[in-house]
Amino acid sequence: MLLQIYHTNDIHADFPFLSRVHGYLREHRDAQDFYFDSGDFTDLKSVLVQADRGKGALELMKLCRPDAMALGNNEIDLGSEDLEKLTAFPFLCANAVHNDGTAIPGLKSHVILERFGKRFLVIGLAPYYSAQMIPNKYNLFFEMGNIHTTDPIPAVERILEENRGSFDFSILLSHSGHLVDRELEKRLPPVDLWLEGHSHAFVTEKRYSQSGKGERLGRITLELDEQGVRIADSVQLELPKQGSPAFDARLEMAQAAAEEILSQ
């Protein structure tokens, strides 16, 4: 049996691109297929994001029915107060807390999703290390919004250990960058699939996928049988230029609402 995982990263409020994703998924995604995003979907350069601090933008993302989304630095830039209002969306982050170390209400570290009797452990990570593996690199800025990221290594180790025997396949939605992910892999127990973001790279390997800066749609094909779950294929899809009329209609309404808010 085949199961598809669709994946985006670093869309940075490029809603015309998301319209193309929406159109493609509506046509090709089966009911059981996954869609994940690895962070930086929002961006405060966007009028739509500025107007209501990300709520309208994420309502548009909901049209694509994501199963889980990583917390990127652009989501963290919204600050704790606004981020807490968005936790109805399927954000995951195992290494972000308030400055005082308390949990961010509603923000989950991981989920276990089931498809065809197989259990998929999905973990989200926000940036902590620089590309040169300098720790604590982002917190000077993050802490201005009362969010602090922590070392992802013990966080992932803990989740893998606590869920030992409760999953068949592990997926990391990592907004850490490809070079950091390669270093993390050396220091972590095995993770089956890394869906990456942050470094805006194109990565197409069986266990790694990253789709530039909101430029392509990753598609990973899994084979499921009584022996387990295996990665069969990984590609980056160049989407048709034509977007989704249904999405575009909602986008037009959202943009009008944003302009009205900002004009007040």
Each model region followed by its residue ranges:
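Acidic, metal/ion-coordinating pockets
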Residues: 1-263
